[in-house]
Amino acid sequence: MKAIATLPEAEQAVDEMTALLERLAGVLEQETRLVHAGKVRSAAALAAAKADLAGGLFAAGERFKANAKFLQQSVPARCKTMLRLQEGFRGILQKNMIVLATAHAVSEGIVRRLSGDLARKAAPQVYGATGRTTAPGAKQGRPLALSRVL
């Protein structure tokens, strides 16, 4: 990691960080829209771009931390602008995480329900001591195979 020592380097570092934040925010917003619309496969295609941008943002953030004092002294206005952008990015990231968590919970619920239904169908229908049908035992369960090809 190269130290930032001049004003042009400081301006370039802030500009690069700002560009990374804006591009990653755009990818996250697109992913959020796609998942919200149920287009999970299209959203999954953004994973590589999202990972690359996140890695670049992490590296730029580490460089920023190492040179924070110089950056705040040499380009304070750009640093303030970047902080405002970062606050907006946090909101976008939070919304994205909520949408992804919701989609995950819904899909997990569907798989659990399907697994339970299949286990009930595979188990013998017998009556227990109380006169009611018994729930299938754990040994009655079978593996559930899913095809990712729709």
Where do the PLM segments sit?
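Short terminal interaction segments
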Residues: 79, 83-150
